[in-house]
Amino acid sequence: MNYIITKNRSYFEKIGEYNYCSLEDMILGDVISLDTETTGLQPRNCDIFCVQLGTGDNNYIIVMYNDDYEFKDVVPYITGKTLIGHNILFDLGFMYNHSFYPEKVYDTMLASKILYNGAEDKDNYSLPYTHDFGAVMKRELGVVYDKTDQKNIHLVKLSQPSTIEYSFNDVDRLIELHNVLLDKIDSGGFRDTYNLHCRYIRALAYMEQCGLPISSEAWKNKMIEDVENSLKWKQVIEEYIYDHLPQYADRQIDMFDERKRINVSISSPLQMIKVFNAFKIPTKDKDGKDSINESIISKSKHEFVKMWLSFQEANHRVTTFGETIYKQIENERLYTNFNPMVDTARLSTRKGNINFLNFPSDSVTRNCFVANKGNVMVVCDYSGQETVVAADLSGDKAMTASVVNGDDLHCAFARVLFPELASLDDETIIKEHKDKRQAAKSPRFAFQYGGSAYTIHQNEGIPLDEAYKIENAFKELHAGLYEWGDKVFNVAIKKGYIESADGWKLTLPKFDKYLEYKEKVEAITKEQWQMYKQGKLDYKKKFDEQEKGRKYDYIYPIAVKYYKSKKTEVSQFFKLKSEYQRLCLNNPVQARSAHQLKLATSILFDWIIQNNYINQIKIVNTIHDEIVCECPEHLKDIAKEAVEQAMLTGGNHYLTNLKIKADANYGESWGKAK
């Protein structure tokens, strides 16, 4: 039965026939569904105009506009209840604005995202699953709701039958939906990660409402410096082109402008490709298309590349971290909205919002994030989080030594690559052989996250033969990591997914296709493989000769025909296998690291609630492996200890053999607290 709870019954009687009751008449169990309709998207400048509650038997709309009920009137009836919502992160923000902080919530959108992480919807052209309310209701219960009124309900409110029906529908079968999803969560072994994420979104909603403190004056000064730096690099680029490529020099005399001008626009990728080609800097990607993307041009050692990348970085600071941010400052704070999870369980920012996770880490930028007057910033981060997690999962000896003894992994890899360093300790290598340590650094990161010899060949411009030698050296140093990765891979291709922390799972992309290709490839005999390789070489030979303008006739036409008939399924099979192997090394580490930070944030938020520090100790950002808080000066030591302890507890909860370190500091800005 549907009921409207209002002080203005006559208003709704003009719209249609409805059932009515009072707040006291509501029959609510321990678990209820909840939704809110609001006048806009942001709690700091909008409000709730109705709350909908559902029990599975009855649904209630409580009206909160036109001098009707207030949210505080509803609070006594929902305090202590378990609340089920869909994207309840949104509703929590508005409830927090009314000083109501539910202790236990569940979210059907989170459940859907966790269940179908990485999976493809076979009923929708194998596109990724969608998780909006309508899509989940249709998929799980076969119920189709008309969501047309969703776009305008903040304007028309409950003034027409369709918006009233829409509001009832949002809670009508929500408990049933949650029960169906929960059965799948339990049978699939997802319960622990689901519970964590439902606990975590309470903290995430708080972080959204806290906002990130920023000094508008400091940001404006940074903007001025960034523009000046960008113009400086623009001039460097233009003068270099003028001096070295006379065909692009504008020689027309201008009595009022003595600059070295060029007749090419450096903001035009098409025109700049011609400039790069004139410098004989390769611009072809793996598909043969021209690009001046960093990953393509950085393979060249030409000095113009370094200048260009410096200009691009300077320009990026202006276009992305300049006026765009400044315009969104509200009372010396920035706000954003988060997506609770991506496929690695990491946090992300919702599309169209400021990306709090992507601010440059330089001191100039970070020092713009200044605590409000009388406050300080408290920052705590993990020490080598991903190395610790990878070492704990894999048991790799080199990584474990790095965690336990403080060994430098870049130095360890440098010793393998450069035998002359074998007898030197870390300190000597860092001081006297910085170039060789640096040479080991980039490939080591690439390999640790599932890259291959081909990856560093493409990204670093290293000859392929040398890249294979470097890869083999890394595999020798980190044999334990690869042995573990192979085990994860072998389990994953049997199950069709990678499992990591708390039952978090990632469905292998295009797994059905992989199995199809695998069957066909495994059916190829030894003799057929010989023919395939022979045909491949002959096919490549003809291609190379034609590129040189020379005629070439196949020596082994039958082998070439066989190669061409099999090359798609063979290449696709090995491409997917390589992608899976990369994911098996990377995803479990990323997912476990994400769970560590989410548990730490949840512990901290619960502590803030329990100790009545709401809106005093604020969680203002969590980025990768750190938590950033703001608090009054007199609470800085209490906050420092609490953040540090939360991170240690959350981090070590997910480790079996090792311990992780976390160090907190405070200062007037994010940068000075690091």
Predicted regions and their residues:
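Active-site-proximal helix-loop-helix substrate-binding element of RNase H-like nuclease domains
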Residues: 2-12, 42-186, 196, 411-427
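Short, conserved secondary-structure transition motifs
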Residues: 110-120, 266-267, 274, 496, ...
